[in-house]
Amino acid sequence: MNVSKWIGTGIALHAALVAGAAAAPSVALDIGHFLEKPGATSARGREEFSFNRELALEIERALKQHGLRTQLIGADGAQIRLGARATQGRGADFFLSVHHDSVQPHFLQTWEHAGEARNFSDRYAGFSLFVSRRNPAPGASLACASALGEALRRAGFQPSLYHADPIAGESKPFADRANGVHYYDNLVVLKSAASPAVLFEAGVIVNRDEELVLGQAGTRERIAVAVAAGLGGCLDAKGTKRER
């Protein structure tokens, strides 16, 4: 056996694998909110940040299985300004901010859960996706948002659509109604991102039934697999080279 040739081949193969991994598209996963200001409160009193972190970690696993590189932002729950979140994701090829949804205050009702009065609204359910036309890559942002929405619908999830309602606090026009994509031009994390960017509202946690579904590990896995499929396909379609 030619040992030198074998070693040389091994080194070359390792270098090729390293180069392939480095060429894989990267996704910055922004975990919405932080411990001191955890976002919306669910119908049963759970803070949005905990939903966001659990789902983002599941999405990270799915993206890695799909061959993508990832960067988590905000996983430790420390406060990060909105503009700084976008700055932290500047090295990535795509920026995805993970959230869970509520409703406008006038839609909230009160019920008792575990001996405490809690706000809820069963009026709306479903996911929403947002893009900004002030992002430096609005076309790519919309293309990937549409791909995400389509993949989520194929997985059995439905868009909420209510963010387009002509009421105070909403009126976010559709960018792609069928796939639940809205324009939200002034959203800081979207317009400040250096790469194509989407904000993903996975579901409405003030809806009592949807909260229970979103809290299930199986649901998180289904969402994550759909997100990885949609985003992976979008990045491929953009011509980004990725090791398969």
Feature-to-residue mapping (PLM):
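Boundary at the C-terminal end of the N-terminal hydrophobic targeting segment
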Residues: 19-25
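Alpha-helical transmembrane segments and their juxtamembrane interfaces
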Residues: 15, 40, 107-109
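Generic hydrophobic-segment detector
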Residues: 9-10, 22, 35, 42, ...
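Positively charged n-region of N-terminal signal peptides that target proteins for export
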Residues: 1-5
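Short glycine-rich His-centered loop
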Residues: 25-45
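Active-site-proximal helix/loop segments of hydrolytic enzymes
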Residues: 50-244
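Bacterial N-terminal signal peptides
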Residues: 8-18
